[in-house]
Amino acid sequence: MKQYLELMQKVLDEGTQKNDRTGTGTLSIFGHQMRFNLQDGFPLVTTKRCHLRSIIHELLWFLQGNTNIAYLHENNVTIWDEWADENGDLGPVYGKQWRAWPTPDGRHIDQITTVLNQLKNDPDSRRIIVSAWNVGELDKMALAPCHAFFQFYVADGKLSCQLYQRSCDVFLGLPFNIASYALLVHMMAQQCDLEVGDFVWTGGDTHLYSNHMDQTHLQLSREPRPLPKLIIKRKPESIFDYRFEDFEIEGYDPHPGIKAPVAI
C-alpha cells in the first residue's frame, strides 16, 4: 500500500487549503489515480489497523439495498451513526440506488443484477456501470454519495473495476473504500467464474482534514507490511447471499490503529 502513503504525502506537499461543508477545513488536491493488482494481495492498509468487520458488513448492507442502520448496529458497526435520523434512516443512499434506482414510469432498476447479467452475457460491453449519483434524489439523502460511480471491465478472463470518488477523506475514508471495492470485485468475479484483475481508484476532491494532520504524519512514519490474502470460503448461489462468515483475511499484520475525529 505504498501508493496510499504516497498520496498522503502528495496532499501534504501540494494541497491547497480549502473550506468545506463540515467547517473543518482541508488540504486538497484535485484528480488522482491509483491502480491495485488484486492478484498481488488484498489492498488493506497495513500502516494502521483497519476495522474489517465494518468494511464487510457495510458492503453486505449496500448489496441488500438497505438504507437503515439497524443491520449495522446488530453487527456492532457504527460508521453511519452520525448521519442517521432518529429512526436510523439515511434516505435513498447507496443501497437504494444500487438495487432500486427509480424510473419515471414507477419501475425500479436493480443495477447490481444488471451488471452481473452483463458480465455473464456481454463481458465486452463498455456500459457495465453502477451509479449512486441520482441527481433527482440527492436532496433526500443524509449524505450525498462520495464513491459515486464504478465500471467493470473484462479482459483475458480477469475482472477489473474502476471507481470514481468525487470526494475523498484520505485518512479515514479511503482505506475503507479501497478495501470495500476490492472485496466487491472478488465477489463479482467469483459469481462470474472470472479471476480478479485490477482495482483502479480515481479521486476528485482528494483531501486531508486539518484535524487529521498529526495522525497523517504518524502513519507516514510507518513502513508498509506485506498485503494480506482474501479467502472466500464458499460460492453462494447469488451475489446477495454472501454472509460475513464467508470471508477470511489471511496474513493481516498491521501497525496499531490510529484514532481520528470524523468530519460530519
From Swiss-Prot:
It is found in: Cytoplasm. GO terms for molecular function: thymidylate synthase activity. Pathway: Pyrimidine metabolism; dTTP biosynthesis. Keywords: Cytoplasm, Methyltransferase, Nucleotide biosynthesis, Transferase. One of its GO terms (cellular component) is cytosol. GO terms for biological process: dTMP biosynthetic process; dTTP biosynthetic process; methylation. Its main location: cytoplasm. PROSITE patterns: THYMIDYLATE_SYNTHASE. Belongs to the thymidylate synthase family. Bacterial-type ThyA subfamily. This is Thymidylate synthase. The lineage of its organism: Bacteria, Pseudomonadati, Pseudomonadota, Gammaproteobacteria, Enterobacterales.
